[in-house]
From Swiss-Prot:
GO terms for biological process: translation. GO terms for cellular component: ribonucleoprotein complex; ribosome. This is Large ribosomal subunit protein uL4. Belongs to the universal ribosomal protein uL4 family. The gene is rplD. Pfam families: Ribosomal_L4. It comes from the Bacteria. Residues 60-71 have a biased composition (Basic residues). Residues 43-77 are annotated as: Disordered.
């Protein structure tokens, strides 16, 4: 269980939020988080890289010159891998890089990773009333008031899609906005700081807290 300070729009402390997620045992936590991260990164690979072998490259059916008598090295095809424009030896072919992992394991890895980042977590009051229209400058100033360097990699977790908040944040280079029901382990681990609204924390707690 972790108690997090809740900050308002001005950056003042106004309360506390409790994060009590189901986490993996200490001896297996690193392994399960690593497996889940590897799964996500592997599943994101397109696997479409492709090269042609000497049998697939067009042309090269005729022997370039006779076997003996020219003084040149023997050659059987202009599409040999030794030649410019020839085939590729052991080059990549389209393949499926995806892995599988049990659903319960993935959820456990995600909740373990999120709770492990509690020291870098900033909980704030809901933003819906603060953005009647998109305003990047106001969001940048608020992030600074919350004690975060705007040059850091930041993940902002919202409970639901809020168009004005999204439009305000999309021009901030290292800010990524995700929804509480779209959490993923890569963004959680890659971020320098995580900002989450009180309602988003409640949603995460509802989904990942004390899961049986």
């Amino acid at each position: 269980m972790v108690d997090c300070v809740v900050k308002n729009w001005q950056g003042e402390e106004v309360g506390q939020a409790t994060l009590n997620l189901r986490v993996a045992k200490e001896e297996s936590a690193a392994h399960i988080v690593h497996r889940s991260l590897r799964l996500q990164m592997a599943n994101n690979r397109q696997g479409t890289a492709s090269t042609k072998t000497r049998s697939e490259v067009r042309g090269g059916g005729r022997k370039p010159w006779r076997q003996k008598g020219t003084g040149r090295a023997r050659a059987g095809s202009i599409r040999s891998p030794l030649w410019r424009g020839g085939g590729v030896i052991f080059g990549p072919k389209p393949r499926d890089y995806s892995h599988k992992m049990n659903r319960k394991e993935k959820r456990l890895a995600l909740s373990t990773a999120f709770q492990s980042r509690s020291e870098d977590l900033i909980v704030i009051e809901d933003l819906s009333e603060q953005f009647t229209k998109p305003k990047t400058k106001e969001l940048v100033q608020a992030i600074t008031r919350w004690g975060i360097d705007i040059q850091a990699k930041i993940v902002l977790v919202l409970p639901e899609k809020q168009e004005n908040v999204y439009l305000s944040g999309r021009n901030i280079a290292k800010l990524k906005i995700i929804l509480a029901n779209n959490l993923n382990i890569y963004d959680i681990l890659a971020a320098d700081k995580i900002i989450a609204t009180v309602t988003a924390i409640a949603k995460i707690q509802e989904v990942y807290g004390n899961e049986t």
